[in-house]
Amino acid sequence: MNCYFYTFGCKVNTCETAGMQSLLQSAGYTVVSQPEEADIFLFNSCTVTASGDSRLRHAMRKVRREHPDALLVLTGCYPQAYPDEAAAIPEADLVLGTKHRSRLPGLLAELCQNHARIAAVDSYGAQDDFEALPCDTMPDNTRAFLKIQDGCNCFCSYCIIPYARGRCRSLPPEELRKAAAGFAENGYREIVLCGINLGFYGMEWDGSLAEAVETCAAVPGVERVRLGSLEPERLTEEQLSRLAALPQFCPQFHLSLQSGCDRTLRAMNRKYDSAEYAAICQRIRRYFPDCAITTDFMVGFPGETDEDFRDSLAFAQRMAFAAMHVFRYSPRAGTRAAAFPEPVSYTHLRAHETLSD
């Protein structure tokens, strides 16, 4: 049977889609590049914002209208965070979360045999293992994205991801080396290391992100190593010194800011204040004078005043980011911020002002 994938959200989802494609191909399925050729449609979802949920449901309804006899599989962060909502989506024949994705071929076989809807979302525990999906190619990409970390322990007040991904866990260095070698053997010269909270890589064995980059850079054939999105507080002096010693390391840092206002950062339950964030950026630029630092910037968080917004915007301007991803606050059921007062009005005007400046 032919399978077609829709991938929403971050680069971790891109990695996991490639892994699921590899799993299905090993089980005898064919992954196709055109939806018209598919018998099975798989939707790897993101649930960071409500608009992401809406795009997902719209895509599933459209596919069901155009392919009424196809099988539709919903997987990823949305069903993991909201399993009952996901199971109630009428278009979904199989619902699978972010845990135990290796079960996918068996669940599909069961679905094809019994023709009965399946909901198979397993809950995370306190100490889950890292699930590495087999993958040594990235269709339609000239660089390889390698997931080395999963989960988050931070519980920012607005964020659903700890509930969708479980606690922090890491790909062991030897498995990382083997995965990077597989990509290199298939001609990939650049590898992007990805994770949900990438800076926490190796915390289980007192390791570090620098260790991961060193392991990857030591693989024959790997010429460039990049990092995915980072939380700022774990980039220590020692780690930056080790990264600066690696000629393969590409100094591009995406450091999530969210707000430059300390009052808002406290309400968000972020683990730094604006002065600490600025010091981290200064430290990075000391080791990498020509680096690019990019960031995420949230507007309209509950309780944000005009003065808070002006402080936040002024701080972002002082940081001289190479680029900013600006987005509106989106309430997520189950988070602490969802119970806060309503977000401020005219958020879209503030986002426009930020982008214009």
What are these regions (language model features)?
Residues M1-F200, E238, L243, F249, ...:
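Proteins enriched for Cys/Gly/acidic motifs involved in redox and nucleic-acid/cofactor modification
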Residues C10, Y201-A217, G221, M268, ...:
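Radical SAM enzyme [4Fe-4S]-AdoMet core and its adjacent flexible, acidic
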Residues T47-V48, R165-G166, R266-Y272, A339-V344:
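Short glycine-enriched, charge-decorated loop/helix-capping segments at active-site entrances
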Residues A50, S170, M203, K271, ...:
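Charge-dense, low-complexity intrinsically disordered segments
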Residues V73-L74, A81, E185-D306:
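Conserved SAM/AdoMet-binding glycine-rich loop
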Residues G97, S123, E231, T305, ...:
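Alpha-helix initiation/capping motif
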